Amino acid sequence: MSFTPGKQSSSRASSGNRAGNGILKWADQSDQSSNFQTRGRRAQPKQTATSQPAGGNVVPYYSWFSGITQFQKGKEFQFAEGQGVPIAPGIPATEAKGYWYRHNRRSFKTADGNQRQLLPRWYFYYLGTGPHAKAQYGTNIDGVFWVANKQADVNTPADVVDRDPSSDEAIPTRFPPGTVLPQGYYIEGSGRSVPNSRSTSRASSRASSAGSRNRSNSGTRTPTSGVTSDMADQIASLVLAKLGKDATKPQQVTKQTAKEVRQKILNKPRQKRSPNKQCTVQQCFGKRGPNQNFGGAEMLKLGTSDPQFPILAELAPTAGAFFFGSRLELAKVQNLSGNFDEPQKDVYELRYNGAIRFDSTLPGFETIMKVLNENLNAYQQQDDGTNMSPKPQRQRGQQKGGENEDVSVAAPKSRVQQNKSRELTAEDISLVKQMDDPLTEDNSEM
């Protein structure tokens, strides 16, 4: 008796002929039924594991379940023993055995002209079906991860028919309670396991266009089973509209908002503060010195907003490494905060001493070393306001360029201010004599 996922057990005997391509055919099933929906178009040959292009844009065979897509690089696809078989109505626990097959998807060209490879997607096939139908359970095959229920016999193939995409839709992948999903992966919720298949893509495009016409004509919304790519933006726009904010206008940071952000950061405990443009490093933790010796001029202004900070954050220890990998010491200190008339609180310091070890194999090692060398003890070379020592003031009357020190800095405005003597000309002497002559009365008659 063959089992069909999502349906009750079939009453037909399992004496059907299994073709070489892995599709189960009954004695009364003709080959013409497969071309029923071609509408005069030439039938496309079925892709197999051997004929799959190197780009990986064709999924060989059809899985009964939706795929699991990787979204973080470097994460291994694995399940614990006894886990990893999807739930399917009509499939007993004794037939819950098979493998996950890695489908390497195609690459695409980005806007800047570079090629970007999509992360792989995994599909489940029951034991004895799919691209590795003849492989024994547990065989070491690249891109294959074997899973089985504890009640299943892995020495015999699963008595499950292959999926016919023309009559059976893929089942959304679900697991029993307690199953731990691989980290860095998510389950596809579209309900299709062959997104690049021509038949399913045409059917989905026709269905989506018909659905859009129906929605436009009726004015009602039809719920969809998939998650659209712009759903996050739509939700954000609805939230902003509810709050009375326009999502299209850029948010401007005013002095009032910057002050509120700074005060919000300063209200946190010292070890929970994250300096940024609105609340600088000096405002959060004080001036640089021997005990706080990290940060160049640019990083002190931007804080964690500095473009170089994320790569440094990779070196930061976790909470577990901080407590279990450091030397800790608890000390009671004097409370210098608060007024004298307020009740004094007991203040303690949890002092720590540890080290962060890394080597040249760390990704971005050269950049990390460059940033560390630029910011460690940078306060000793700084001449701006972040330096511990004030900027030396120039002495009064002193100029740059090695000029005479007795020369005034400001140029005199007139010869009177210069207070310098000069020789009298003949005209000046004549005027002086006229001023010295006594006044004589003029008795001439008019």
UniProtKB/Swiss-Prot annotation:
The modification Phosphoserine is found at residues 166, 190, 389, 421. Residues 60-189 form the CoV N NTD domain. One of its GO terms (cellular component) is host cell endoplasmic reticulum-Golgi intermediate compartment. The keyword Transcription applies. ADP-ribosylated. The ADP-ribosylation is retained in the virion during infection. Residues 9-22, 195-226 have a biased composition (Low complexity). Residues 1-54, 157-230, 265-290, 381-446 are annotated as: Disordered. Residues 29-38, 45-54 have a biased composition (Polar residues). CDD domains: CoV_N-CTD, CoV_N-NTD. GO terms for molecular function: RNA binding. This is Nucleoprotein. The gene is N.
